[in-house]
């Protein structure tokens, strides 16, 4: 919302965005949501409450496939809600999964579960009469959707690599602690959705403030050498540093100010890699997390939401100034960055044995969409059947995939046989398909300008043909497609990134790398799928013939001069 409101009489202070007024007048996120729930004349919420329900983990959407048809029939759009669960670190138990699966089948328009790039799941197509029911179900399961959207700290993600399960457990515990510590303290969620007793007017938000944050805030924890969480896509990232003598994490490198969204036509917006602040000990993580959040709370831009993210605050005030303020407020000094190396960002598919002698099976879930829509791939049914017999846990990855975790040696065959029976495991999936992902886009995302999730599978097939033509079947290029420039599928950290411009047309970005530490550059703007395929055929052919040993596609297109590397996106992204 770009409207402004006058918050004071000092004409030297910029007007605040209207979102700030909505938050300020919401009575700690209550607004008139409860009254709107009882309004049966519309399937949605009014404009202000549609903003506030985001803080409760929901987005108001409509089915864009039927928008014109319904308008012709003089009907309002098919308004529905998308709910995103809070699931720090992406761990969910089989019995929780079964209940979610059953609810999605019975009470959503689409009957699917969507795994996200932030290690959680979304339910699309929730109608207003079912909203209280889904929140009550989550509460019964020990889950909620608090702060998975809105101007707050979002779902905290961490490396899901089961190969180092001792380290994974440590970062998962930390992810849960950070998530809980930074949650809104308002009782509005329980009052509205769980019919909890209304509290007296004693709400306060000592960390987030009564107007919460200027914009959404994202936190990730990575365990090198795996960068599956894409540390440079987050406002705040912790990179684990392991003891040389034990399987214990002794501290973290801290990165601040990453973010990938931009606005077409506005060169003051751009994707930005995070800045290295320094190394801290494990005991200081919560204090640093709180302080980075509060500095951004106080210094972030509340007048122009396009410039409200942490990355723009760092650009405006300077990295050194922001870092010094964090040290001053927290009393924690940053030490020099400890050495670390990222070598990969993908998931390890198939069976992997953990150090506790249990096994972990990583399943490829194309675009994270779990459904029974394909009769040859009954993902929903197969995973539900496994949940009925599995005594371990499920882990959702930041690459939209699913890990069946904690499987005993005796149960491996039974679980794998079940998954093969329903087509969940397919040995023919190529490395290229496994390295590709897309955001949801049409028909439910209101921001989508072009297809993404529904476009990607057939597009990947065409890329597979190109790879095969040049005998690159065993190789993979990090490919990401988003329906708009917000980069929910992290296209601005891919080797090949497509961002939607209009139906059937995309911007093509090249030159990111395969470990997520370089932003790609715009190669061609507003082009068709055929244009994209022709460009990729040519550049992949050259890569096959001219590459150095083990050189990735992204590194090749930079070295060969097809695109210039983005070094400092604040200055050279639009060159």
UniProtKB/Swiss-Prot annotation:
Its cofactor is siroheme; [4Fe-4S] cluster. InterPro entries: CysI (IPR011786), NiRdtase/SiRdtase_haem-b_fer (IPR005117), Nit/Sulf_reduc_fer-like_dom_sf (IPR036136), NO2/SO3_Rdtase_4Fe4S_dom (IPR006067), NO2/SO3_Rdtase_4Fe4S_prot (IPR045169), NO2/SO3_Rdtase_4Fe4S_sf (IPR045854), NO2/SO3_Rdtase_FeS/sirohaem_BS (IPR006066). One of its GO terms (molecular function) is metal ion binding. It is an enzyme of class 1 (oxidoreductase). Siroheme binds at residue 488. Signal peptide: none annotated. Alpha(8)-beta(8). The alpha component is a flavoprotein, the beta component is a hemoprotein. Belongs to the nitrite and sulfite reductase 4Fe-4S domain family. This is Sulfite reductase [NADPH] hemoprotein beta-component. It comes from Blochmanniella pennsylvanica (strain BPEN). The gene is cysI.
């Amino acid at each position: 919302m770009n409207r402004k409101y006058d918050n004071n009489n000092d004409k030297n202070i910029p007007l605040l965005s209207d979102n700030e007024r909505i938050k300020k007048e919401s009575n700690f996120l209550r607004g008139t949501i409860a009254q709107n729930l009882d309004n049966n004349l519309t399937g949605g919420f009014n404009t202000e409450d549609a903003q506030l329900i985001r803080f409760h983990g929901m987005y108001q959407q409509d089915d864009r496939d039927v928008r014109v048809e319904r308008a012709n029939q003089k009907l309002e759009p098919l308004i529905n809600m998308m709910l995103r669960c809070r699931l720090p670190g992406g761990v969910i138990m089989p019995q929780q999964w079964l209940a979610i699966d059953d609810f999605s089948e019975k009470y959503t328009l689409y009957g699917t579960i969507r795994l996200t790039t932030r290690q959680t799941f979304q339910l699309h197509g929730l109608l207003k009469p079912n909203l209280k029911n889904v929140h009550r179900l989550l509460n019964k399961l020990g889950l909620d959707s608090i702060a998975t959207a809105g101007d707050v700290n979002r779902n905290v993600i961490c490396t899901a690599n089961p190969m180092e399960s001792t380290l994974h457990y440590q970062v998962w515990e930390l992810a849960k602690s950070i998530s809980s510590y930074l949650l809104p303290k308002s009782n509005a969620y329980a009052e509205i959705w769980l019919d909890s007793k209304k509290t007296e007017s004693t709400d306060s938000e000592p960390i987030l403030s009564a107007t919460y944050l200027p914009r959404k805030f994202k936190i990730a924890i990575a365990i090198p050498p795996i960068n599956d969480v894409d540390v440079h896509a987050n406002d705040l990232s912790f990179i684990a540093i392991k003891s040389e003598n034990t399987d214990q994490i002794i501290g973290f490198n801290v990165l601040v100010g990453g973010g990938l969204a931009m606005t077409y036509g506005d060169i003051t917006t751009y994707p930005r890699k995070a800045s290295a602040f320094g190394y801290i000990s494990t005991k200081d993580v919560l204090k640093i997390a709180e302080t980075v959040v509060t500095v951004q709370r106080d210094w972030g831009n509340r007048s122009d939401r396009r410039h409200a993210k942490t990355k723009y605050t760092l650009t405006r005030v300077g990295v050194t100034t922001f870092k010094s303020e964090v040290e001053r407020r927290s009393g924690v000094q940053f030490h020099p960055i400890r050495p670390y190396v990222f070598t990969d960002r993908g998931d390890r598919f198939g069976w992997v044995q953990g150090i506790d002698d249990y096994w972990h099976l990583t399943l490829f879930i194309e675009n994270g969409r779990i459904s029974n829509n394909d009769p040859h791939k009954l993902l929903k049914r197969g995973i539900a059947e496994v949940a009925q017999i599995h005594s371990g846990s499920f882990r959702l990855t930041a690459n939209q995939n699913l890990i069946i975790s904690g499987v005993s040696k005796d149960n491996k065959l039974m679980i794998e046989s079940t998954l093969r029976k329903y087509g969940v495991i397919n040995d023919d999936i190529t490395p290229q398909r496994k390295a590709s992902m897309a955001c949801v886009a049409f028909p439910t995302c209101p921001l989508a300008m072009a297809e993404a999730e529904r476009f990607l599978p057939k597009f990947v097939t065409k890329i597979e043909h190109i790879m095969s033509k040049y005998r690159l079947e065993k190789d993979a290029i990090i490919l990401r497609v988003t329906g708009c420039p917000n980069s929910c599928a992290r296209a601005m950290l891919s080797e090949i990134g497509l961002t939607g411009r209009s139906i059937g047309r995309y911007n093509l970005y090249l030159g990111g790398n395969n470990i997520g530490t370089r932003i790609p550059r715009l190669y061609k703007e507003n082009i068709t799928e055929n244009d994209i395929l022709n460009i990729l055929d040519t550049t992949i052919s050259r890569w096959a013939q001219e590459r150095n040993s083990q050189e990735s596609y992204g590194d090749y297109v930079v070295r060969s001069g097809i695109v210039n590397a983005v070094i400092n996106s604040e200055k050279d992204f639009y060159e």
